[in-house]
Amino acid sequence: ACIQGMQNGEIAAAVLEDQYAMPFVSDGTITYIRSLTYDDDFKVEPCCILAFNSDFAKENPVHVKRYTRAFQKAGVFIEQNTEQALDILLQNSWASGDRDDDLALMQAFDYTITEQRTKDSLLDIIADYQKYGVIDSEQSADEVLAKVWAPVLDDVQ
């Protein structure tokens, strides 16, 4: 509905996920203004963070570590074998769309985000949220971080 709304002049802009917007950007229907995928100031930011319920993490530390390690190894594989990874996704119907667009999007991501970069990004987000009043600014960023994040692995690729 957002795309049609922009085409009809009913809305001027929309916030869309890059994966959703890409086909419309590729065919010239829309132009992106800012992108978490392509803008230089976002390129070192993790797009996603693997999260576990704190009770589950406390009760299953081995599972959490193994899952996180597997997730990290998968990221390294994708980074080093992007086309093969995309083929696996497409063959199993875990991805859909135009192969060239999918490949361009996958090549734009950094799948080897370290714990340190994750920590730095979370501290930036906490500072922004405190600045805008989304979360309490009485606590230090490190205190807030300690409540929401616990690194599982060392920075080993």
Model-derived features: positions:
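Short secondary-structure boundary/hinge segments and terminal tails
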Residues: 23-24, 41-43, 107-110, 145-149
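Conserved C-terminal helix/tail region of periplasmic/extracytoplasmic solute-binding proteins
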Residues: 127-157
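Alpha-helix boundary/capping detector
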Residues: 32, 37, 93, 97, ...
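Glycine-rich, flexible loop/turn motifs
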Residues: 46, 52, 107, 131, ...
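A local structural motif
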Residues: 1, 5-12, 97, 135-141
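Short loop/turn and capping residues at structural boundaries
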Residues: 17, 35-36, 100-101, 140-141
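Secondary-structure end/capping motifs
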Residues: 58-136
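Pocket-lining segment of extracytoplasmic ligand-binding domains
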Residues: 2-91
